[in-house]
């Protein structure tokens, strides 16, 4: 519950302008997060997008956020707007972000 509250706050500050209050995005410009395959199922891809941004798109990297903030906002978007019921509802913990940052061998 605390992760969700923190995630909603991080979302409201960093994400809402493009992805909108209900995660619906803006058609043709900013993708919806509500019902998105990435938010429903692809946890690792979800982490990668926030860490790296999306080349050629308006989505910048948010790697300046703390591990806790990143885990919270990713969990929030995976749980909010009916996503938990439609998808795997998998939560992201700060360790997932730390693990992502580890050098890949």
Where are the predicted features?
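Electrostatic cytochrome c docking/interface patches
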Residues: 1-10, 25
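The canonical Cys-X-X-Cys-His
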Residues: 7-21, 73, 77
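Flexible coil segments in periplasmic/lumen-exposed cytochrome c-class electron-transfer proteins
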Residues: 1, 63, 67-68, 72-105
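Gly/Gly-Pro-rich "capping" loops immediately C-terminal to redox-active cysteine motifs
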Residues: 24-64
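Short, surface-exposed helix-loop/turn micro-motifs enriched in polar/charged residues
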Residues: 22-25, 88-89
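A general structural signal marking secondary-structure boundaries and capping sites
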Residues: 22, 54, 80-84
